[in-house]
């Protein structure tokens, strides 16, 4: 059965080290300078406790490095092992992360390779299931090796806010 855990030093740090090493070939394809990625994202996420780990039957199968700024949850890197990369685990992982952090965030942003149709579709379906808005923005940044979209999933604005808050009309 899948589960999501927060990264904790001396509790599951060896699991994270193992899965991180496994993800390095993919990181190297996406980011030309892996040591810069480590300094900018991995190290701060470890120190800030913003790493979530995905397990299936007590075995590590994925992780995400994220940050929260101005109520925006931003995935810096999201990885699930190739053997377990499917709708069940991916959707479960995203939904659990958003559910755990939903009181602290209004939206989720992540970049997705524009040819990764499965990931784009999965992000859209996650937004639908959680009843959130879904938006894609093209990234025009020469530092990225592959063309990517920023995928934004956010809470829907309340319609008729005054009707919800104003009890004097009854």
Predicted regions, residues:
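Conserved active-site alpha-helix within GNAT-family acetyltransferase domains
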Residues: 114-136
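Active-site rim helix/loop that mediates acceptor-substrate recognition in acyltransferases
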Residues: 30-53
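C-terminal "cap" of GNAT-fold acetyltransferases
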Residues: 133-170
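Conserved beta-strand in the GNAT
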Residues: 53, 59-67, 74-79
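Conserved acetyl-CoA-binding loop-helix of GNAT-fold acetyltransferases
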Residues: 80, 86-99, 121, 125
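Conserved GNAT acetyl-CoA-binding A-motif
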Residues: 101-114
């Amino acid at each position: 059965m899948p589960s999501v855990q927060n990264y904790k030093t001396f509790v599951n740090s060896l699991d994270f080290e193992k899965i991180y090493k496994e993800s390095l070939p993919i990181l190297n394809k996406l980011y030309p300078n892996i040591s810069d990625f480590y300094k900018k994202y991995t190290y701060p996420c470890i120190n800030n406790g913003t790493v979530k780990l995905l397990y299936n039957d007590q075995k590590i199968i994925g992780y995400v490095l994220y940050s929260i700024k101005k109520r925006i949850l931003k995935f810096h890197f999201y990885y699930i092992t190739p053997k377990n990369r499917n709708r069940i685990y991916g959707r479960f992982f995203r939904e659990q992360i958003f559910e755990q952090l939903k009181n602290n965030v209004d939206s989720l942003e992540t970049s997705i390779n524009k040819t990764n149709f499965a990931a784009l579709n999965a992000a859209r379906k996650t937004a639908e299931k959680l009843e959130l808005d879904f938006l894609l923005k093209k990234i025009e940044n020469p530092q990225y090796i592959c063309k990517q979209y920023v995928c934004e999933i956010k809470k829907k604005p309340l319609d008729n806010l005054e009707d919800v808050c104003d009890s004097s009309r009854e």
